[in-house]
């Protein structure tokens, strides 16, 4: 029953007060079970059918799918339930207490992106869900801030095929239809230690890595020359050498050297294609020094993403907002949801607030976000 639903600000307050931090470090990582239970109960009160899905390979994490309405197609509204860890020394407020001050709502997850679920629930007060002609789905995922395991698993296992989807990441209500991907690798060279007084008795891993880096930088130049997408501010795939470590003493031949690097591919570039390009670039080193070079993933890769610019979803949202869709360099769950249906990234709050101390969402987004959610539900589920 709608009258059982708390007021908007109380929903928001309860979401922020329920910790759901995702972290690669086990000591910081938290289950999102309590938050999923909170959301599930509210959507059940609104008449939705709710499914809770354990996400394999995680530390007690869950997805939630709330659905209402019959038939094929419909609209999917999606978001992640987790937040990044917080630096207690840099926050001047309690991260888990929603605080309103000077036109801003402060708290961990206010913008990125627990707040989106408060907007959805609040908008549904004015929607007669018994009259939907197409289904409405609400997806809440786990571990977006680390591995994106929730969205990956949902996309791999669901039979759902909505007409379109909107992911409510903070875009300042500017619709995003494309972003780059992200691939990070560790390049490891195994040499052979020895005393520096006799170089011939060892294999210096730093020298081999120097050779490998030359080929990697050549790949970087080739990516810049071969691939182009004018809409991006950096209109080509980027390759960055981010961290290197090797050796332990100036008088010892270095036995091991490790380089961490990333590539941010354009939409349309496949992960297999990128892996092939990297392996081809490093092939001369591997052939010259068999068995000494390995390439391993640092994190699960994220492909680039693009919603067709002429899709009905793009046209409808651009008309409703009076704004053209954009492309961005950061990553979201959109590549995985896009495998189910055309997807836009669009939500309240600024991406500049994501992962920041004293995170906030400006209250000026409340009314237009509520109106937008109501309008897209009416357009895609009532017509």
Swiss-Prot record:
Coiled coil residues, start to end: none
Annotated localization: Cytoplasm
Keywords: Amino-acid biosynthesis, Arginine biosynthesis, Cobalt, Cytoplasm, Hydrolase, Metal-binding, Zinc
InterPro entries according to UniProt: AcOrn-deacetyl, ArgE/DapE_CS, Bact_exopeptidase_dim_dom, Peptidase_M20, Peptidase_M20_dimer, Peptidase_M20A
Cofactor note: Binds 2 Zn(2+) or Co(2+) ions per subunit.
EC number: 3.5.1.16
UniProt xrefs under CDD domains: M20_ArgE
UniProt pathway: Amino-acid biosynthesis; L-arginine biosynthesis; L-ornithine from N(2)-acetyl-L-ornithine (linear): step 1/1
Catalytic machinery residues: 82, 144
pH effect on activity, per entry: Optimum pH is 7.7.
Annotated Gene Ontology cellular component terms: cytoplasm
Swiss-Prot/TrEMBL catalytic activity: N(2)-acetyl-L-ornithine + H2O = L-ornithine + acetate
Chain positions recorded as Zn(2+) 2 binding sites: 112, 145, 355
BP terms from Gene Ontology: L-arginine biosynthetic process
GO molecular function: acetylornithine deacetylase activity; cobalt ion binding; zinc ion binding
Cofactor field: Zn(2+); Co(2+); glutathione
EC class name: hydrolase
Binding residue positions for Zn(2+) 1: 80, 112, 169
Family: Belongs to the peptidase M20A family. ArgE subfamily.
Stated role: Catalyzes the hydrolysis of the amide bond of N(2)-acetylated L-amino acids. Cleaves the acetyl group from N-acetyl-L-ornithine to form L-ornithine, an intermediate in L-arginine biosynthesis pathway, and a branchpoint in the synthesis of polyamines.
Subunit structure of this chain's protein: Homodimer.
PANTHER family: ACETYLORNITHINE DEACETYLASE (PTHR43808:SF1)
Protein name per the record: Acetylornithine deacetylase
Organism: Escherichia coli (strain K12)
Gene this chain is encoded by: argE
